Amino acid sequence: MKLQKPKGTQDILPAESAKWQYVEGFAREIFKRYNYAEVRTPIFEHYEVISRSVGDTTDIVTKEMYDFYDKGDRHITLRPEGTAPVVRSYVENKLFAPEVQKPSKFYYMGPMFRYERPQAGRLRQFHQIGVECFGSSNPATDVETISMAAYFLKEIGIQGVKLHLNTLGNPESRAAYRQALIDYLTPLKETLSKDSQRRLEENPLRVLDSKEKEDKVAVENAPSILDFLDEESQTHFDAVRQMLENLGVDYIIDTNMVRGLDYYNHTIFEFITEIEGNDLTVCAGGRYDGLVAYFGGPETAGFGFGLGVERLLLILEKQGVALPIENALDVYIAVLGDGANVKALELVQALRQQGFKAERDYLNRKLKAQFKSADVFAAKTLITLGESEVESGQVTVKNNQTREEVQVSLETISQNFSEIFEKLGFYTQ
């Protein structure tokens, strides 16, 4: 048997992982400005953590979860999304306690798992970056979080992004709308897809965002959630819209957008961009004020979003956006002869300990091959170290771009290379 990676997974090799590191680092910097702190949860959870919060009737739970019984006969699932594990952690660790500052803001990054048909930008092991904010029902929290996502997408370089906005109202408004939707769809049941016929019985709102052609036709004249909002829900949604407008964030009201998870209420949103004629959601989220209490904590407001890293990178690639990744070596040491081997090791270590990105040859190759390696690594400077240089204690350092050279002592390189580096036209941080 040929050993290969499982279907729906990928190896992220160095050329690609540099892009991942850039995106993750960029997100950390943005989140830090908004006072978010990182939380890391297990990649597997008890089955009930996901099934009860995400919803027993959702596609995630009924079709896509990786779940199994461990050796202790515990029902375990690999996490398919990030919010439920963070809420579980928030409650379990009593982060709702009075001494914890509110709102409490967390972000997470890591792998998620769903058993679905692999395709471009959608894998069975995929990676999410997300944020969760607990303790504020203020609509300004909705808007701050949405605008943070908009800022991140703009600054990372995603083009043509449109914000789709909707509300699911409070539980009372949602219940009234649910009944109206059942009344509307029941006479049309036989025209719906098999999945949507099931959804009509279990969670009729999910029919609204079905991708099946017959379902899209059926919901064209469906009632709008906006007609069933009570005063509280309407006031919250109006405030969100007004604040977005005050911040200059454009949006589209999309009453057929309901999101694929059952825990949302009030504001929900998606950032969508068009790629090759297809609408791709790059970031999505919303408010979930009942989820903390559902996990056994006190009544606590919540708001958050998640974005898929694979899809983000796919969109950047399709849009021709080159991330500003710096992979160049500061120094490459070409080594000539066995007598220079030990000194080359000492020198490259000294350079690294001064903060320089440095590499040397270990393979006793001809100089031409070593110089080619320096070019492949885009080395800014080149040092050729042979037995004669070791004996004299003097070496030539060359700017590998301009070919300018300086003669310096090995001791100077070992103790203060930054002075030489700057003399050759480069700057140290």
Swiss-Prot record:
Family classification: Belongs to the class-II aminoacyl-tRNA synthetase family.
Bilayer-spanning residue ranges: none
Keyword Amino-acid biosynthesis belongs to the record: no
PANTHER family: HISTIDINE--TRNA LIGASE, MITOCHONDRIAL-RELATED, HISTIDYL-TRNA SYNTHETASE
Xref: InterPro entries: aa-tRNA-synth_II, aa-tRNA-synth_II/BPL/LPL, Anticodon-bd, Anticodon-bd_dom_sf, His-tRNA-ligase, HisRS-like_core, HisRS/HisZ, HisRS_anticodon
Entry annotated with the keyword rRNA processing: no
Originating species: Streptococcus pneumoniae (strain JJA)
Main EC class the enzyme belongs to: ligase
GO molecular function list: ATP binding; catalytic activity, acting on a protein; histidine-tRNA ligase activity; transferase activity
Protein name (database record): Histidine--tRNA ligase
EC number, UniProt record: 6.1.1.21
Subunit note: Homodimer.
Subcellular location: Cytoplasm
